[in-house]
């Protein structure tokens, strides 16, 4: 089987019913940071403590403006001799221009890597399949491994899955090795798994709209409140210590006559009426017709609240439990 991306699109499947699947992640992009000041520079730009990040760990953190609003969130890790991060391709150019603003004063090179290949490996037997190709696999305890030009990231949520950062040659080998027993899908399958995991999706429509806590990044250990200064730190700290944050990320599931776009609002049922509320971050329709929506809503919303896609008289959405706790933020 010849390697080319994106893989043909199939309706996404929930993690509980997902067979072994290779997923082309063309909707995400890779950026690298190299140079003597790479750690110091990034430490002043993102919410995570980069000084404390070890080579076998990855972290989801935020890159904010001076008001604490996220330009984007970043899946950050070490790769080769430098740092790397993965973010949504839709906001890559704008986010990079913001990140590079002060780089001229530091020994750091920040560069997109358009030739890098990003592939998700998920579903039943994902670990077993990868073990036939890689001699060392990442785990929950050590979620990043490096082998040659390849970096493997492990995710425990919503179920065990892996993200491979590699080159075309290694990707070709993976596809050939697993072609007989794996199915293939495009970025929407990984998007569905991220929604199920409660990992916030920030696309261009929602860039510079939310503080990190409005998307649960603090619950995913993506904010350090003890590190030194970084852009937007004052507003992020205020949200924690003064209770300024009134929003949270939710996973909704149900029926809808259409899949809402990022940036749309939803409607919340109040008696016989519907009130507009919240902001859609991402949405997907599964193979069984169910619609999943990831949205930022008021964080005091009752668990049994009924919502719907805007002006959709035929559908309703219910709040689903996230696989992590927000208790420490209340």
Swiss-Prot record:
The keyword tRNA processing applies. It is found in: Cytoplasm. InterPro entries: GcvT/YgfZ_C, tRNA-modifying_YgfZ, YgfZ/GcvT, YgfZ/GcvT_CS, YgfZ_barrel. One of its GO terms (biological process) is RNA modification. GO terms for molecular function: folic acid binding. Folate binds at residues 28, 190. Keywords: Cytoplasm, Folate-binding, tRNA processing. Signal peptide: none annotated. Belongs to the tRNA-modifying YgfZ family. NCBIfam families: PRK09559.1, ygfZ_signature. Folate-binding protein involved in regulating the level of ATP-DnaA and in the modification of some tRNAs. It is probably a key factor in regulatory networks that act via tRNA modification, such as initiation of chromosomal replication. This is tRNA-modifying protein YgfZ. It comes from Yersinia pseudotuberculosis serotype O:1b (strain IP 31758).
